[in-house]
């Protein structure tokens, strides 16, 4: 576990925003979420932080979102999880916050394309020329930002996720020459998001 730097004040937006995406603060994030999950219902913590973290779920190969969602998925039906399960939720949220990384562009959902059409406008990258971590260089990739911004507003979150997973499953099948792990995550992360939808404000979608 990384050493703590200094506590994150969850009520101070300037402070916690400066720590988003800073993995060296992962332990600080963990302590913040542990504290909040002791003081508040876990559903309320997700409702508060979900809209903040969703735009940056791409970071850490989407593992923050996936870990958080699967922690919730394993909660008992009476929604009264054990201390160990609550701590796993805190760890998932902390990893998500520490690896927070939004995609380039401003996906304000004012575009006109569904996800499958937007995919057709994405530029192609030679896997052999990819350097650095996954996603490195996307800001400078011609056409990528405009493709992200071309997405239309989703009127139904569940349907939008289904469209997304189906579209990227098609990409995975159509391109066996591409390393599969990144593409698999474009399917598994949105699918995992289904577990959090009941606690995310609908206006986010």
Question: What residue ranges belong to the model's regions?
Answer:
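Mature, well-folded catalytic/scaffold domains that follow N-terminal targeting or propeptide regions
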Residues: 1-205
